[in-house]
Curated annotation (Swiss-Prot):
Entry's Gene Ontology cellular component terms: 90S preribosome; nucleolus
Gene designation: RRP36
Coiled coil: 257-313
Cellular location(s): Nucleus, Nucleolus
Protein name: rRNA biogenesis protein RRP36
Biased composition (Low complexity): 109-141
Length: 401
């Protein structure tokens, strides 16, 4: 009992001394900062004491009131401040980290949704632009030595392909190893496809691309393509056509053409008359009808003239052949007409038939028309006029009348 009462007395005296020390200002307080929690000038400061006694503050206060001191209180005479541990909670950081992770996940989901909503064309354009930027950056990153070595190797390869002596060694290209080769392949990937199949010289064999697949169906023996022919006009089935026999068999065709031509001529005249007297609204229709009839009449006229000309030529040639046959019967030697003689004979017969149909005026008109045509051809083929070219004059081509 005596010991307990003595211990209580000593505890009470210590508390009174501590209260007095707190009330009395210390001269060292001026050197402390207002927000400082640690007394830097305390001599007996030990940072590990608070960790050793990590009991609750309420229990400590209760024990102090009871007067039971365990010797863990700092002496207030040695220092003016008391260190207390911070109320740090580790769960707060974990909560903040989880919140930041959730925000990042939400942003990623928003970006993914935006990308999914974009059209494919926009994504393709973006990918192309990124690939161009990457290729340009890689090409710019190459050093000058690498480019020079690649140029030398290309020059040597071209000279070898042409069969010339290699004047530029390509040993420098091996310094850079596979990096230079890869960059060369990337830069020349486009034009290499076209130049690889090009021959080095005209005597070299033709080169084909290996990327082009060869067809499995191959023509080993070339079979002649069958040609379809009409048996009516074939020389195998019909034989040689006899013009005289054909003209005699179809002698009614020229008469039909003449009747058709006369009927079309009357129709054209009636169409012209109707075109003149028709109202303004029907003018385009009447004009189109007249033009159609005129075209048809011209076609029939051409056929009729050609048939008459062919009949006249056959008649003249048959007459000449008959006369030659009679001369042979009389004992003369065989004679064969040449192309020039045949042309003169047909021209003479043409003028004779024209004179029978239209008289001498028709022959004169035909001769004058032929002369003008030949004169125009001669003028076009003449050279420049004398003095028209050079000597500081106008170099424009002139024709002599």
């Amino acid at each position: 009992m005596v010991t307990a009462s003595s211990s209580k007395a000593t505890g009470a005296t210590r508390l009174k001394q501590a209260n007095k020390a707190v009330k009395e200002p210390s001269p060292d307080d001026e050197f402390l900062e207002s927000d400082s929690e640690v007394d830097e000038f305390a001599e007996g400061f030990q940072p590990g004491l608070a960790e050793e006694y990590s009991d609750d503050d309420d229990d400590d206060e209760g024990k102090e009131d009871d007067g039971e001191g365990y010797g863990y209180e700092e002496s207030e005479e040695e220092g003016n401040a008391k260190w207390e541990p911070d109320n740090w909670d580790g769960n707060e950081d974990t909560v903040s980290e989880s919140g930041s992770d959730d925000d990042e996940d939400a942003e990623l989901r928003n970006l993914q949704n935006n990308l999914n909503s974009l059209p494919l064309s926009t994504l393709a354009k973006a990918q192309k632009s990124l690939s161009r930027k990457s290729s340009s950056s890689s090409s710019n990153g190459r050093s000058k030595e690498e480019k020079l070595a690649l140029m030398k190797s290309k020059l040597a390869q071209m000279q070898r392909s042409k069969g010339k002596a290699v004047a530029v060694p390509d040993t420098d290209s091996h310094r850079f190893g596979s990096r230079a080769q890869e960059s060369d392949e990337e830069s020349d990937s486009g034009p290499e496809t076209t130049s690889s199949t090009k021959r080095g010289s005209k005597h070299a064999p033709a080169a084909l691309s290996t990327k082009k697949q060869v067809s499995r169906k191959r023509q080993v023996i070339e079979v002649p393509k069958p040609e379809r022919r009409d048996p009516r006009f074939s020389s195998v089935s019909a034989g040689h056509a006899n013009a005289d026999l054909h003209s005699k068999s179809y002698s009614f065709l020229p008469d039909l053409l003449r009747q058709e031509f006369s009927g079309l001529k009357e129709a054209v005249a009636a169409a012209k008359k109707a075109e003149k007297n028709c109202p303004w609204a029907e003018k385009p229709m009447r004009t189109a009808e007249r033009e159609r009839l005129e075209v048809q009449m011209g076609q029939v006229r051409t056929k009729l003239v050609r048939t008459e000309k062919e009949a006249m030529e056959r008649e003249v040639l048959a007459k000449a052949k008959k006369e030659e046959r009679e001369k042979r019967t009389q004992g003369k030697a065989a004679w064969f007409m040449k192309k020039g003689e045949k042309k003169d004979l047909l021209l003479k017969a043409r003028f004779e038939t024209l004179e029978k149909q239209g008289g001498k005026t028709a022959v004169k008109k035909l001769v004058e028309k032929k002369r003008k045509k030949l004169a125009s051809k001669e003028k076009k083929s003449r050279p420049f006029a004398k003095g028209a070219e050079g000597m500081g004059r106008d170099t424009k081509r002139r024709r002599v009348a």
